[in-house]
Amino acid sequence: MKRRTTKFNYFDAFASQAELAAKEAELLMLVVENFDRAEKLQEYLPEAHRIENEADEVHHSIHDALLPDFVPPLDREDITSIASSLDEVVDLIEELILSFYMYDVRFMHTDAIEFAKILHKSCIALCGAVKEFPRARKSVPFKAGVVEVNDLEEEADRLLSLIHI
């Protein structure tokens, strides 16, 4: 049986997932800012799918490493939950971009640009927090990142409530 010579770094993998979420959010921002017709979205779909596939590969690598890992740095359930949650961010953003095309969207609400910007800022803040995750207990930037993500979520909720009025 071949032994692994290097220990898998789950924290680096989480950081990669967060960076891919930020890339997908940046693409969403580009899609929304440059939207004029659904047909034009076809040019963005391959890149959205490429990013999502890359995120899936990282997600799978985490699970592949976790199975034989005798003593992972966190509880197995926590690693699985974190990896799945970060992957879900990328999946949902890709799904949103694809939905614009699939539902043949003809009009983009003016607040959609602001909403996409908030989502992108949230993913950037998530990246910062995830990079500090190994030092979470003593890290001021980690705590600040978590607060920033929560603040941006509240900002997005306020914007969404205004749109629905």
Please provide the spans of the model-predicted regions.
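Disorder-to-helix initiation segments
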Residues: 1-17, 71, 75-79
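Short, charged/polar, low-complexity loop and linker segments
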Residues: 1-5, 27-41, 64-70, 98, ...
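A structural signal for well-ordered alpha-helices, especially hydrophobic packing surfaces
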Residues: 18, 22-32, 52, 59, ...
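Amphipathic, charged alpha-helical scaffolds that flank and support histidine-based chemistry
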Residues: 38, 73, 97-106, 113
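Hydrophobic/aromatic-rich structural module bridging two neighboring secondary-structure elements via a short loop
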Residues: 41-51, 61-91
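Extended, positively charged loop/linker patches that create polyanion-binding surfaces
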Residues: 103-138, 142
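Short, mixed-charge amphipathic alpha-helical segments
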Residues: 141-151
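Conserved small/polar residues in nucleotide/adenosyl-binding loops
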Residues: 163-165
